[in-house]
Amino acid sequence: QFNWGYDPENYNVPEGSYSTNPYLGDVRIREFKEMVKALHEAGIRVVMDVVYNHTGATADSDFNKIVPGYYYRQTTDGGFSNGSGCGNETASDRSMMRKFMIDSVTYWATEYNIDGFRFDLMALHDIDTMNEIRGALTEIDPTIITYGEGWDAGGSALKPTEAALKIYASQMPGIGMFSDDIRDGIKGSVFNAEEPGFVNGQFTFDERVKFGIVGATEHSQIDYNRVALAGGASGPWATEAAQSINYVSAHDNNTLYDKLIATLPDADEETIKLMQKQANAIILTAQGVPFLHAGVEMMRTKDGDHNSYNASDEVNQINWNWKNENQDVYNYYKGLISLRRAHPAFRMSAQEDIQNNLTFMEDIPLGVVAFNLENNANGDSASDITVIHNATDSEQVISLPKSADWQLVVNGETAGTEVIEVIKGDSITVTPHSSYVLMIDDSMNTTENFNQLLLIAGAALLVIAGTAGYIIYDKKKKASK
């Protein structure tokens, strides 16, 4: 039966069913290496989704046959602890399990030239193990990426104070955490399909969105009580924005399109499209690491299947006709990515820089979040960049930080580095369900195409998540190791 592969049996061998001949062990190894090499030659870094937190078998697993009970945590009555929800959880806090994990990731990094690791249910691992993994990978290549889910599936035998939870990110420098704060703030809870978020009508989630915009770092303009009341964190958890993996959707739970349909079953397709654009316009203009679910740029649907781990290709495949049908959404996402790459102001990481150079605009209508990036933030060519997210169903007149000739590069229909229009003055009318980006950049020639900026821009981190595979684009990385 098809399964994403979250039932590990042998951690150090590629899955054979993806090879041309699964019955010959060397074929899967050779072809996996060839795949990684080809991706590197195309300028694409490869991140593995690793599931060290549990095994497919429990009592009969290889680990349990070596030393019964040692590699798994137990409950007080002697049973197997099940913080993974899959029947068991491995004991990373025991020295030989920790050693196995370190040996395994360093093997993948050196033998297969893997560029990063995404840890499933990372909070089932202890803080010390995660820090040792980060240290071992840094010795191999400091640019290797490590991030994961800063939560578990409930009921772990590991002491909470020892677990690699999101709230303890400050104790794990160099390790990123998925931000469910901005995820559910934007679109609503993943555990309640009908619950909306900011873009689909729950405007009281605006503070949670703002918290995500500063990359979960401390900022004087964030009301953390309101963040918590909206179901988010009770305080900042990231010491730098690079620790915050900002996303709206991934392979788990509903696709963004399906979530929007579930919350607004009577909405017309054009309104859903606007929300689909705005959701990731928030992500791609926020501080932190943007993460996009593969297919979100073409309105991917799984027909409402929120847990498709064992569903067929009919559900999980990408239908490339979606791209033709939703070319406008695709181009919009592409333009936002170009904008982010061209402007380092969107890529600050230090908390102090974000505090000093990102100012939220106040006295604005409910349902609108707006901020200004100022002081040529992070060495940007633009002295000011103003971002406005209007999630309401009506036009909103928004005052700009100053009276100037503002270059509009993003509105509800178009996004990119080219100037759409020059807005003269100190206010702008923002259309419903739309995100706008305006800037003051003397280096921009408003009569020419600005795609050439991509040639000189620093690379931004962008994660494209498929079902269980992750690809990272980074122009600074060499084509292959």
Put a short name on every predicted segment.
Residues 466-481:
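C-terminal membrane-anchoring or membrane-association module
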Residues 11, 39, 108, 119, ...:
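Conserved, mostly hydrophobic/aromatic
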Residues 272-273, 284-292, 296-298, 302-446, ...:
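Carbohydrate-interacting/catalytic domains
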Residues 92, 118-121, 234-235, 260-273, ...:
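Active-site rim elements
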Residues 134-135, 139-299, 309, 358, ...:
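Conserved alpha/beta catalytic core and glycan-binding cleft of carbohydrate-active enzymes
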Residues 1, 50-59, 121-126, 149-154, ...:
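Short, solvent-exposed turn/loop segments enriched in Gly/Ser/Thr/Pro and often Arg
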Residues 1-112, 125-141, 145:
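Substrate-binding/active-site clefts of carbohydrate-active enzymes
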Residues 36, 105-109, 134, 245-248, ...:
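Non-transmembrane alpha-helical segments in soluble domains
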